[in-house]
Amino acid sequence: VIAAGAALPFIGRPTRAATTPGRLVFGLSSYPPSLAPWANTGTAAATARLMFHRGLLGYAEDGSVRGELAERWERADDGAWVFHLREAFFHNGKKVTAEDVAWCIEQIAAEKSTAYLRAQLQDIAKVEIPDAKTIRLHTKDPSVTLPLNLASFYAPIIAKDSFKESPHGIGAGPFMLTAEERGVALDFTAFDKFYRPGLPRLKTLRLIAYADENLRVAALQAGDVDLIEYVPWQSMTSIEADANLTMQSTPGPFMYLTFNGRVKPFDDPRVRRAVAHAVKREDVIKAAFFGRGTPIGGLPIAAGTPYYDARFADSLGYDPAKAKALLAEAGVGTGFSCKLLSTAQYGMHKDTAAVVQQHLAAVGMGVELVLPDWPTRVTLGNRGQFELAVMGSSADSNDPDGLTPFIASNVTASYVRSTGISTPDIDRLLAAGRTEFEPAKRRVIYDELQQKCNEQAPIVALCFRAQAYAMAKRVQGFKNLPGALTFYSGTTIEQTST
């Protein structure tokens, strides 16, 4: 199948379909498992939500934090974060008010909430509403990272009590959701009261799911879609060579392994470290990403960024002899069997799993692959129904605190992280980094964090990967955001034209 997909550019593709001015058809990698506003159900769902939901803050195309529903914000003398709302409207015609914002924060942080950012927003101790366009957030401790959490696409602002009108809530994004063809496509029309004058540039938008990555590429080449996400790595070279297409690629997302600490022997950090030392990252990059990646032997902190430290960068790198020694020390030196959860829907996940299976076998671990479709993989992960799992994602921001969802143990259960592993030292250091405003002191904290993570191995990072969008040459304005923010690129559809 891969060979056929790779050959498509050279075998007389169909004539490109005619384009309707003001309309964009976007090929997603999956139909969103859920459009619940505050849940993490994958990149396709996040992209779809960015069409009709927006938060207080978001990201500009250069990766900087920008205002969305808040036109400006500052930290007050008493330590509170103050947000000043712009004139904005929800899709039901009601004005966005501070009361809506307060209600959303309460819903996300509620004790029984399943929101992805519940733990982070529980740091907000008090919410004040001086007037309809101002909201003051007092945190339990000083927080340098609260604006980053509020820029997340997991923290959109919806109209108060609007679940009565829509299961997804009523948002204030650039497009209104007008039709859902379950498992197939989502249709949107431009919202004429969007808060940015002159935007969106498109009149209509269709997000259509192509779970088969080769069919997704073929649809772009044939002109059936104008833009695709998750360009498969085996197709990147041919797309770059196609005069009708443009590809935008950035490093940032990473592949990693998660563990179920309730299942022996993965409760033992020595076994988790052994798994790390057993896997040759270069083989993952070659098999899954056609060489378009960079090995990670510690935490996924990119070289050249302020908090990267070479001393910790390869502490968990490939060393099969050390892996065997650690397994023996943990009392499982004679080997054991386990199941590795991945998915057949994304080639990168499946291929990564195959390489991991091969390398773990070399140190005595018999691994059976479990390869359901993506929605099932998400459900199993959220329920903690796995032993060992392959995952690919991106940090929530380019700040080290953006790794909190992957390595903290005091956050809401999610398919993106390990389960049943308690790491209080890591949780303490993450909290300390959040409350420190001095960069030099934050660096000391994150150095210690890297050391503790290399000892406890709450996850095992494998490699950074190139992440690309591809589009017809006529598509203008779309931007692939840098580094960890690549999955926020859907934000720029508001400025995209055809």
Map each language-model feature to its residues.
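N-terminal lobe/hinge region of extracytoplasmic solute-binding protein
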Residues: 27-77, 106, 168-171
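Gly/Pro-rich hinge or "lid" segments in bacterial periplasmic/extracellular proteins
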Residues: 64, 148-206, 212-214, 321, ...
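Surface-exposed binding/hinge segments that line
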Residues: 74, 117-159
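Alpha-helical secondary-structure segments
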Residues: 98-106, 132-138, 173-174, 201-204, ...
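Ligand-site clamp/hinge motif
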Residues: 193-238, 358, 366-368
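Structural transition elements
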Residues: 295-329, 346-349
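Extracytoplasmic/peripheral linker and loop segments enriched in polar/acidic and small residues
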Residues: 362, 368-377, 404-473, 497-498
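Long beta-strand-rich cores associated with HINT superfamily self-processing modules
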Residues: 469-498
